């Protein structure tokens, strides 16, 4: 019972932090990781994409928190611990799905309108993954959210991701 209470509290806090972090859509001149012309943010198409992104982000975060409440009632067993751990990390990963969708949609919109891609957009895959062989830094500031992300083109970046995935 105590384990479920602790896991539920951690899940709600972590999903809440993810929500607050991912809610910041405009960072370093890039809207959801895509650099657009200054007047493009006011276009109805762009506003629609942003509103859909925020709506899906809220829905997924609320569903993950509600799903955690349902897991609270599982009987005590080792299976419950496994389910909690998988659900916890799965919930954190699910919150990034709207980011991937919105980034790809904005990139297609940029290409449709013929707006040039900024040089800073090239090494970013989906606005989340950084791959720049010419950049020797192991980690760089994120374009979506807070913190840093690994440069997947460097050995140190790959090792950092591998260690985090194993841990």
Feature annotation, model-predicted:
Residues 50-63, 155-164:
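Select subsegments of transmembrane alpha-helices in polytopic membrane proteins
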Residues 2-8, 61, 69, 167:
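Hydrophobic alpha-helical transmembrane segments
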Residues 1-18, 80-96:
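Alpha-helical transmembrane segments
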Residues 78-116, 164-167:
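Alpha-helical transmembrane segments and their immediate juxtamembrane interface regions
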Residues 15-21, 48-60, 121-129:
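Alpha-helical transmembrane segments of integral membrane proteins, especially early/N-terminal helices
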Residues 64-79, 165-167:
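Juxtamembrane "helix exit" motif at the C-terminal ends of alpha-helical transmembrane segments
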Residues 23-60, 98-116:
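Cytosolic-side membrane-entry/anchor segment at the start of a transmembrane helix
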Residues 20-34, 107-155:
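Membrane-proximal soluble regions of multi-pass membrane proteins
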